[in-house]
Each structure stands twice: as structure tokens, then as C-alpha cells.
């Protein structure tokens, strides 16, 4: 078994962002000996968007020898490929060059204030303190950024920068190239229908059950981790209504096949 530190893997900003919630998939109970596994990996990543691809690369760099990404669509990108691409981060060299007063601490304070103080201070500070590191991580993995910062639409402060290229697609293009270089396969048209663990809602996660195009079913075992990076639920009327019933009447800019709706 590959020795992969959970702290090292999940401690990186890109990988931590990958620990998103997954909807439309349920847990099942299965004794490991009772399942005939079709393939075994060290790390299985669900979702080939920005978070999932970052998690896969991070896992490989943290020591996982065999990593796979599962994507239910026929192409990678998720919501990231539809995003404008702007990245807010208080990077000292950038704001000093622009003559702006900024810092990760100020970024956190302004973010909390913009959310009427409802955000979790610990998580917000983690976000703003790790943002410069995440930008550097992306640069180290092939993403090139424009040489200026600006106030992104919907934002209140000047601290965003855009990648050079097709907006959010620039991130995906670079990460796909790294996955190819690192021999990280992406299984397209592969939908996760069950996360298999020792007990219904407890115990170690053993792997996943997937359905591929044409109805083929596979059981994939994970010796170290299953990372759920399958997006949110902005296109799911039932779940968004929990926060605000009016949201069910709105359209969405989310990916055409988010996890909560298919």
C-alpha cells in the first residue's frame, strides 16, 4: 500500500478545496471480502473540475502511486470551465506594485463583513491565508496570469487576477496537461452511484460503485482515500429551497449536469 499522509494531502489548499459535498450519491454497506473489485487505486477522485483535478495532482505529488479521476460527463471542466476565471488573493508583490493596502487578514475581515458576519471565521481565514499559496500552486502547474489586479464584478475590493487564456478553461487546460504528464487517468462517462464503506454511515470508505455509458457497472477499490469533488447543489431546487424558497424560481449558471440533478 502506498504510504500517503492524510494530513499532507488534505493540508494543501487545492486539495482541501476538493473536499466538497456530494449529492445524488448514497452510501452502501458492504464487507470488503464480499465485493469483487474490478480495479484498485490508492486515491479515487470524483469529479474532473478544478477541485477534482487539483486533488488528483496533489495526491500524486503526495506519494499516491495510482490515482484515478471519475467524470460522469464526456469532458472535463465542471463549473470551473464555465467560470470567469478571476482569482481573489492578497499577494504582497501584487498589491504593493499596484499601490494598494491589502493583506490576507484584511481580505478575511472584508469577506466576513460582506457576509454579515455569518461566515465561519476559522474557515474564512484559512481561505484568505491560503489564497496566495494556491495562486502560486497554479503557476507552478502551468497556469499563467495576467500582470494586473482588478476589482472583479460582484466584488468590493481590488485583489483579483485573471489567467491568460479562456477564463476558467485556462485552469482546466493546465491541470489536464499535468494529469497527462503524471499518468493520472480520467474515466469519462463514468458516474458514481454508491460510495461503499464498512458500515452504512460509519467506518472506513472502501471504494465506489460506478455506472458507465452503456450500463456497464464497475466496483473500484480505494486503499487510501475517496475524494468527493463533484460540485455543489446550486441547480437543485429542493436543496436550495432549504436556504431560500425563492431560489427555486431562479435560473443558474452552473454546469448543465450538476450532481444534484442527474
Where do the model's predicted regions map?
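Glycine-rich, N-terminal phosphate-binding loop of Rossmann-like dinucleotide-binding domains
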Residues: 13, 48, 230-231
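Conserved beta-strand-loop-beta-strand element in the redox core of flavoprotein oxidoreductases
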Residues: 196-219
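Aromatic pocket-lining residues of Rossmann-like dinucleotide-binding sites
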Residues: 59
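A short, basic/flexible loop-to-alpha-helix module at the beginning of a structural domain
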Residues: 27-39
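N-terminal secretory signal peptides and thylakoid transit peptides that target proteins
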Residues: 1-17
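Beta1/beta-strand and adjacent pyrophosphate-binding region of the FAD-binding site
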Residues: 37-51
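Conserved N-terminal/central alpha/beta ligand/cofactor-binding core
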Residues: 66, 72-185, 189-194, 203, ...
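Glycine-rich loop(s) and the adjacent beta-strand/alpha-helix scaffold that form part
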Residues: 215, 221-262
Amino acid at each position: 500500500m502506498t504510504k500517503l499522509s492524510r494530513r499532507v494531502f488534505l493540508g494543501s489548499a487545492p486539495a482541501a478545496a476538493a473536499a466538497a459535498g456530494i449529492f445524488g450519491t448514497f452510501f452502501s454497506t458492504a464487507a470488503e471480502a464480499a465485493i469483487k473489485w474490478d480495479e484498485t487505486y490508492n486515491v479515487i477522485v470524483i469529479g474532473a473540475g478544478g477541485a477534482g483535478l487539483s486533488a488528483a495532482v496533489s495526491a500524486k505529488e503526495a506519494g499516491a502511486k495510482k490515482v484515478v479521476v471519475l467524470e460522469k460527463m464526456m469532458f472535463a471542466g465542471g463549473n470551473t470551465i464555465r467560470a470567469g476565471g478571476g482569482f481573489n488573493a492578497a499577494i504582497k508583490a501584487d498589491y504593493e506594485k499596484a499601490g494598494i493596502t491589502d493583506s490576507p487578514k484584511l481580505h478575511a475581515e472584508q469577506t466576513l463583513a460582506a457576509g454579515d458576519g455569518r461566515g465561519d471565521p476559522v474557515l474564512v481565514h484559512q481561505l484568505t491565508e491560503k489564497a496566495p499559496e494556491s495562486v502560486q500552486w497554479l503557476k507552478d502547474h502551468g497556469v499563467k496570469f495576467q500582470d494586473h489586479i482588478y476589482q472583479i464584478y460582484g466584488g468590493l475590493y481590488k485583489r483579483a487576477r485573471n489567467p491568460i487564456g479562456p477564463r476558467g478553461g485556462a485552469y482546466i487546460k493546465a491541470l489536464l496537461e499535468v494529469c497527462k504528464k503524471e499518468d493520472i487517468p480520467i474515466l469519462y462517462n463514468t458516474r458514481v452511484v454508491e460510495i461503499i464503506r464498512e458500515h452504512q454511515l460509519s467506518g472506513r470508505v472502501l471504494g465506489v460503485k460506478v455506472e458507465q455509458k452503456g450500463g456497464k457497472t464497475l466496483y473500484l477499490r480505494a486503499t487510501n482515500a475517496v475524494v468527493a469533488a463533484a460540485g455543489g447543489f446550486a441547480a437543485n431546487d429542493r436543496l436550495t429551497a432549504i436556504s431560500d424558497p425563492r431560489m427555486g424560481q431562479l435560473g443558474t449558471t452552473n454546469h448543465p449536469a450538476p450532481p444534484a440533478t442527474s
